[in-house]
Amino acid sequence: MAKEIKFSDSARNLLFEGVRQLHDAVKVTMGPRGRNVLIQKSYGAPSITKDGVSVAKEIELSCPVANMGAQLVKEVASKTADAAGDGTTTATVLAYSIFKEGLRNITAGANPIEVKRGMDKAAEAIINELKKASKKVGGKEEITQVATISANSDHNIGKLIADAMEKVGKDGVITVEEAKGIEDELDVVEGMQFDRGYLSPYFVTNAEKMTAQLDNAYILLTDKKISSMKDILPLLEKTMKEGKPLLIIAEDIEGEALTTLVVNKLRGVLNIAAVKAPGFGDRRKEMLKDIAILTGGQVISEELGLSLENAEVEFLGKAGRIVIDKDNTTIVDGKGHSDDVKDRVAQIKTQIASTTSDYDKEKLQERLAKLSGGVAVIKVGAASEVEMKEKKDRVDDALSATKAAVEEGIVIGGGAALIRAAQKVHLNLHDDEKVGYEIIMRAIKAPLAQIAINAGYDGGVVVNEVEKHEGHFGFNASNGKYVDMFKEGIIDPLKVERIALQNAVSVSSLLLTTEATVHEIKEEKAAPAMPDMGGMGGMGGMGGMM
């Protein structure tokens, strides 16, 4: 297929047009008074969203060069969301402003490479000032404030996220699901839970709830399949002498072994339950090891030279309470050494940092949470499917942003942090590097201006007023007042501001230093020919009518 090439100003102007269109669609969602965007779906009802990245993801332009510009900035919005959970609109607004200012200067003759160098230096200096101005997230109240702002000022969502984090800790897993009704709920599972239920309903101790509960129990862990009773008989006799319940976690328990366990349970000889080991393959081995470390036990594996026949009571794990239903097993109050658990947690964190697979990362984070204290499930309620999707997106964003705040700290929100940081930056640059520096200094005012415009105020006037002051002084777009942002709880995670600025500068630099674009020429499809009408029979005899 033939390709078309665009050069220099012609290419950059078309790229800018794509960035402008994306920016104009996304910018309206910014701030507490941001507007909704209605998105047509290929089937079903249109979706309504105030989430910048959801809007950006839907945008495809007909002009191939303009579309390339839009796609590059869209990628920046997505990357910002992935890394920080929020700040997609901030990144888009910054990228547009930097590109617009830069394009004007490059068209006037500035050297793009020198301009880029100045932009990079300015961004780095601003980020350093942001870090100095940040403060660590203190208590539950600040977590609630961050989550509320990221959920588009929904205080109920902010409170749910803060409650969830308080219950499971900053390393705990918090998942978001759809509720059955219209109310939002929070469910917390304490201890380690895995998705394997009892192998026989005859192990049940509570017939009403259909659960098996074992208190102060031993746990036998093995990666073997148990089919013969003689494999575990010596160990059973030893545990019976101790008079404690026993949970067996094995690859499988079948045949004679399972039958004998059930019969002895029913007769009251043994207080016992059995479940299959969680996971598959290598992940199963790692999860068994996690349970062993949490409970102070040892996985009985032939790979380690251990056999069930020769196993001692010292190899068994211990837990204060174990609850098993038909689908899940929950181990609470494992008696493992806290130092061993900390070492295992550190090991899993290292694996999370080094893995490139999203699936592996998710599974490792689940394991980390189970070792760290529990899993919280936020159940989002809504009256309609459209509202449910929009609300679920907001909760996901707020959750990620809150984790970012706990990780790196917080700065004042409402677009004021960038302006305050820039006020403290004074770089002695020359020529076109200085042009790049000044481009960034002007562009960082854009987020605050846009928040004010969306709330119905004059962006320029608001920016000027904020620039006149220092410290935590900023603009509350919810009520149009100038306030102490920290006292009002208007805060942003440092990580969100940092990544938004870094990504915006990165993509703008790429666009400004682009000298040519190559794209396919769309071939015009010829209109299909009219079908052959054939001879119009019978017309020949009309001569006789004369």
UniProtKB/Swiss-Prot annotation:
Keywords: ATP-binding, Chaperone, Cytoplasm, Isomerase, Nucleotide-binding. Together with its co-chaperonin GroES, plays an essential role in assisting protein folding. The GroEL-GroES system forms a nano-cage that allows encapsulation of the non-native substrate proteins and provides a physical environment optimized to promote and accelerate protein folding. GO terms for biological process: protein refolding. Its EC number is 5.6.1.7. Belongs to the chaperonin (HSP60) family. Gene3D superfamilies: GroEL, GroEL-like equatorial domain, TCP-1-like chaperonin intermediate domain. It comes from the Bacteria. The keyword Nucleus does not apply. InterPro entries: Chaperonin_Cpn60_CS, Cpn60/GroEL, Cpn60/GroEL/TCP-1, GroEL-like_apical_dom_sf, GROEL-like_equatorial_sf, TCP-1-like_intermed_sf. It comes from Helicobacter pylori (strain HPAG1). One of its GO terms (cellular component) is cytoplasm. HAMAP family: CH60 (MF_00600). ATP binds at residues 29-32, 50, 86-90, 414, 492. It catalyses: ATP + H2O + a folded polypeptide = ADP + phosphate + an unfolded polypeptide. One of its GO terms (molecular function) is ATP binding. Coiled coil: none annotated. SUPFAM superfamilies: GroEL apical domain-like (SSF52029), GroEL equatorial domain-like (SSF48592). This is Chaperonin GroEL. Forms a cylinder of 14 subunits composed of two heptameric rings stacked back-to-back. Interacts with the co-chaperonin GroES. Its main location: cytoplasm. It is found in: Cytoplasm. The gene is groEL.
